[in-house]
Regions:
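Non-catalytic, conserved peripheral segments adjacent to functional cores
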Residues: 1-104, 123-125, 132-153
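Short beta-strand His + acidic residue motifs that chelate non-heme Fe in jelly-roll/DSBH
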Residues: 109, 117-122, 130
Length: 153
């Protein structure tokens, strides 16, 4: 697995080693020891899987009381995935990074706790799978508008 820190260094792009031939492919999608070395010591407690159609925008969601870290990947289709730093004491507060994730590039994005997260589906359909560091709590769910002028996505 290759780990690449992005313009906001706490957000990390993961690119797996894919072994493929005419029969198909194999790839390792997560290894705790490597993840801790490159991204920090986090425990994942919930996995989610969503499906969306072209043009659907999900997010940008974040939490205040129990912020979720998310390791996200696309297993079908393509999305433009965005993380916005919502940590008020961070030197990158209000800044964002975005990456295309797809079934073809097989890349994943680590979005740490304290970030707003969302994605836009750019293919006909997309299936999105992600691990979370805390449980979903609808009472602690907040949204940031994708076109917020101060963020400037």
């Amino acid at each position: 697995m290759e780990y690449q820190k992005l313009a906001i260094p706490d957000v990390v792009l993961l690119t797996p080693k894919v072994f493929g031939d005419e029969r198909g492919f194999f790839m390792e999608t997560f290894r705790q020891s490597e993840f801790e070395q490159h991204c920090g010591n986090y425990q994942f407690v919930q996995d989610n899987h969503s499906s969306s159609t072209k043009g659907i925008l999900r997010g940008l969601h974040y939490q205040h009381q129990k912020p979720q870290g998310k390791l996200v990947r696309v297993v079908k289709g393509e999305v433009f995935d965005v993380a916005v730093d919502m940590r008020q004491n961070s030197p990158t507060f209000g800044q964002w990074v975005g990456e295309y994730l797809s079934e073809y590039n097989k890349r994943m994005l680590w979005v740490p706790p304290g970030f707003a997260h969302g994605f836009l589906v750019t293919s006909e359909t997309a299936e999105f799978v992600y691990k979370c560091t805390d449980y979903y709590n609808p009472g602690d769910e907040y949204s940031l508008l994708w076109n917020d002028e101060t963020v400037g996505i």
